[in-house]
Each structure stands twice: as structure tokens, then as C-alpha cells.
Amino acid sequence: MYKIHTYISLIFCIPLVIACFTGSVLVYKDKINNILMPGVIYVADGNDEKRLKFDELREKIEKEYPHHEIVGWNIDVDPQKTDKIWLLPHGAGEKEWACVYLDAFSGEIKSDLVPHDSGFIGVITELHENLLLEKSGQILLGLTAIFAFIISISGFIVYRNFWANLLRLRFSRMATFMSDSHKFIGVFSTPVIFAVALSGAWWELRFMFMPPFDNSKFVIGPQIYDKNISIDALVQRAASDMPGFETHYVSFPFFDGANITLYGQKPQQSFLHSQYSSTVTYDKNSANLIDVKDIELASKTDKFLSTFRRAHYGDYNAATKFIWFLCGLAPLALSVSGIYLWIKRSNFKRRKR
């Protein structure tokens, strides 16, 4: 079991460290973006105005970017954050998503239109999601997440009496310290790594089990939905069609067969589910109600999958975010201590011969 733990760790340590380290950075991506782009991520302090109407804001965006179409609109659960508007250029073919930040209280566009993978956080996100290798990177990271389970389980077997001296950290010799710290960090970080690895493996590999997505012939333009449909009216109707529903993301049609879908949450829903767990869908031409998916009434499978988002990000509260941040750094520390112990053990065996 020691050999299984060691050699799998050596094979996958680099992608695992990259994925987890970048994940730690992304836990605080809004804070980092606020430093890199001051005055963009959050609305002005002391703003006691009411949000402007969605239709008014949509008109402003369309006037500012006449050759683009809004395909996504994120309204953060934190009212102090600006809205994030996703746009695609008009025309057919595969296109790159771009976004702007919008102060929904003043109507001010707070940033330039930038590609989704631009800037420091954009590059970190791409590294985290696919190692900058697109689908090949997704597969590699998916396999890494699966083998992270094996590494963790085999580690528990190797240190099966870990509970006896779990809190002991000896500094007498480097090898002793590395062994104690390896066990200590591994045991305490494993539950979070389990949750992150499970959700990460699902997101990275599920495209392999879904029909191919070809959006090359879909034409982006003003005709993707009837512009006479009021977004404000849909948001109000959604709160009626699913009592208590709060909209946090509006998805507009950007592929064949898509309609207008509002993602959100209900105040009484379980803390395990995110602010995007429930959906209400309306026809893109008539605004007639098509579907209501209340996560509290969903199947056990859908409920389980819905917990992945918060389990992956750890954004239950400020304390859990910090714990997830620390656990994201754990594979780096475990790799350093593990490689040191492996070299030490190999040298000892060589001298013994």
C-alpha cells in the first residue's frame, strides 16, 4: 500500500498541486479582483439607492455594445457586488465569451468588455479548469481528482494508527518533522479534498458522457429572443411561479433549443445548495412558463449534484472559505514532505544494500 500511495502521488503531484493551489487563489478571487481592479467589483460604499430596472440596464448595455448580445446576467447574492454581464458578438460560429461589470444602482458600466480568460484571475481560472490544455487538460484533471481519492485512502491505510499521535509535531530531526507534518496535514485536509475531488471529477469528465455540443451554426443576434419580453416582468413572475424565488442569474438563448432561464434560490432552502440551485424557464418568444425546478422538490440525485458547487468552493461562510483555502495549499505541503520522505527512504535502502 505504501508503494501505491507513493507512486500515484509522484505521478499526479504536479497537476494536483496546480489544481489545488489555483483553487485556493480562486476562493478569494473577488477580493483579489478588487485589488487588481479597484472600484469595479463592488458598488460605491454608502449607496442607499434602489436597483435600476433590468430593462433599463439592458437598454444601456445594448446601446454601449450594439454588435454584441447579452447571453448571461449574474446578480450576486451580495448586494454590494456589481452585476456581471456576459456577452457574445453577433454572427455564427464558435465565439469567446466576454464580460463587463455593471453597477445596477447607478447604471454605470464599471469595466471594459474583456474575454473571460483575460487578466490574472482569468488565467488562474483556466489553469484550474484545464491547465490551459482545453479538453485534454480537463481529462487529465478529472483523472487527477479520481486518483486523489486513492492517494487519500491509501494514506489513511499507511498511517492507520494516525489517531494515536495526530497532534504530535517533533522538531528533533528533519525526517521526523516531515513525517509528523505529512500525517497531520494529510488527515485534516482529506475531508475537504474528498469533497473537492468528487465535485471536480464530475465537472471535468461529464462532457465525455454527454452528446457532443455543436453550437457553430447558431447565429447570435437580436433575434435570439423577443426583445419585447420584459426581464423585470420575468423576475417578478418567477417569484410567483416559485414562491420566494430570488433570481441570481438570467441565461438568455445562446444555442439551439435554449430559452430564457432564471437561476436562483429560495430563502428556506438547505445551506448545502447554492444560490443557483433552482430554475424557472420561460419561452424565448412568448414568455410562457415552460418549467419550474425547485431543488427542494428535486430527485435525490439532483439534490446530491446540487451540493457540489458549495462543496467545491467552500463558500458556506467566511470560516469555511478560509478552511478550503488552507486545504487547497495542503497538496503542495504534502508533496514537499512526501518527496523528502521518499528520497530519504530510497537513500536508506541504497545504503543498506
Say what each PLM segment does.
Residues 1-353:
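Conserved histidines in hydrophobic membrane contexts and catalytic metal-binding motifs
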